[in-house]
UniProtKB/Swiss-Prot annotation:
UniProt name for this protein: tRNA N6-adenosine threonylcarbamoyltransferase
Upper taxonomic lineage: Bacteria, Pseudomonadati, Pseudomonadota, Gammaproteobacteria, Enterobacterales
Amino-acid positions noted as binding substrate in the UniProt annotation, renumbered to this chain: L133, V134, S135, G136, K137, D166, G179, N271
Species annotation: Buchnera aphidicola subsp. Acyrthosiphon pisum (strain APS) (Acyrthosiphon pisum symbiotic bacterium)
GO biological process: tRNA threonylcarbamoyladenosine modification
HAMAP family on file: TsaD
Amino acid sequence: MRILGIETSCDDTGIAIYDTNKGLLINEIYNQRKLNNIYGGIIPELASREHMEAMIVLLNKIFKKKNIYKYVDMIAYTAGPGLIGSLLVGATFACSLGLSLNIPVLPVHHMEAHLLSPMLDYKTIQFPFIGLLVSGKHTQIIGAHKFGEYEILGNCLDDAAGEAFDKTAKLLGLKYPGGLELSKLASKGIKDYFYFPRPMIHHSDLNFSFSGLKTFAAQTIKKSSKSMQEKANIAKAFEDAVIDILLIKTKKALKKQKWKRLVIAGGVSANQKLRKKSEIMVKKNFNGTVFYSSLEFCTDNAAMIAYLGSLRQKEARNSQLEILVKPKWSIDDLCF
């Protein structure tokens, strides 16, 4: 079975085709980084308009590669969570295309797709496992008991880790999205030149808070000399603090659940220091294994949507005129 995946939850437009026998066949993506750099971030209305244009371009690109009318058996699209305008663009395209091709359409959960995205590389990851979802809008610790049964063990009370990365990078004068740029700058920083606080690490729960850390970084930047070395030192201190917080909480979750498998997913999972330190932590303390996806599948993409569609293909509905989206949608309640 071949599934066409459509991703438009935020500012990345993605289209992919996944074959249940051959794996991923096509994965195309268009990002809005140039536009976001102009405005210093994502403007929801502009993001929606860009999706409309990009979707046509990407679909035409796929049409040239494959005869999609004979090639696709089902369509899966991101129905939430995400920006309402962006979600509606993808959902409308998916439902319209499904209606015209007379094939089933399936709305899927964006964060479940992220959580299972490492399976694009590892094929199967045995349940149960702890999932660390770290992106621009989410920082969650998930207890994945089995496929489709997820428990939120820890949540972010304010700014997500990815958002804190981007906002701190902006204060340092780095281009958007700032997470990768901040990490590059941090690699040039002097270890322990600055020490940033680690909020909530001593709390018994598994929740996160990054707003205080972001404020501390802003105050440090304001007082700094603004030299490149000083900026690098701040970037390093900030990155070290975020990673420590994430791993301290994740370690507690693994210990609490008595599990040995950790999946790290979402845009921040591309951070190389996070990957390295998580492997050391899990191996040393639990003799366990860490799974994460290839870098191309860390940020928003349609490959993970198409793959999740393949796992949930029995739930697909015949094309209807009803367009379903759910901007606020928790992973522990997957029912529409």
